[in-house]
């Protein structure tokens, strides 16, 4: 039942455990389970502006295939390091790396105008997008879909 499934999620002691519970659900693969986990970590207005789970987007991430390829592009060949370790390093050192590279990164701010670092979950996404960007820019691959503009929708004005 859904109640039993959700109870397993509530009993989980880490985001990685929640991910495994989600993956165990019929129809949930690695990608969907991770995306649902990430969504469950956002604060909900109907839940008092707190997330359903007691974890943050910086506690754990599951690198998908694109992120793994992005990490491989960043590292020297045959470096024996766990992908999550690389993502955590990027998260911890992002500000000093932007400074070292003389990049004026446009960090987002929270509701109190405090600058927010790029979360571990978003670093995972960035690594995937980095991989796609490099393969397209170097002509070694293409995007999944070709962009075609849709026809404008015309609304009747009364």
Where do the PLM segments sit?
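Low-complexity, acidic/Ser/Thr- and charged residue-rich accessory regions of DNA metabolism proteins
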Residues: 98-158
């Amino acid at each position: 039942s859904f109640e039993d499934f959700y109870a397993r999620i509530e009993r989980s002691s880490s985001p990685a455990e929640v991910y495994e519970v989600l993956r165990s659900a019929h129809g949930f693969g690695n990608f969907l389970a991770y995306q649902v986990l990430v969504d469950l970590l956002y604060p909900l207005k109907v839940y008092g502006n707190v997330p359903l789970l007691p974890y943050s987007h910086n506690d754990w991430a599951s690198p998908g295939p694109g992120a793994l390829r992005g990490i491989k592009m960043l590292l020297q060949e045959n470096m024996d390091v766990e992908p999550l370790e690389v993502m955590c390093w990027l998260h911890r050192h992002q500000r000093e790396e932007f400074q070292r590279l003389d990049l004026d990164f446009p960090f987002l701010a929270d509701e109190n105008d405090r600058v927010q670092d790029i979360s571990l979950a978003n670093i995972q996404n960035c690594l995937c997008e980095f991989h796609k960007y490099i393969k397209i820019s170097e002509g070694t691959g293409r995007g999944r879909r070709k962009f075609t503009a849709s026809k404008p929708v015309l609304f009747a004005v009364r």
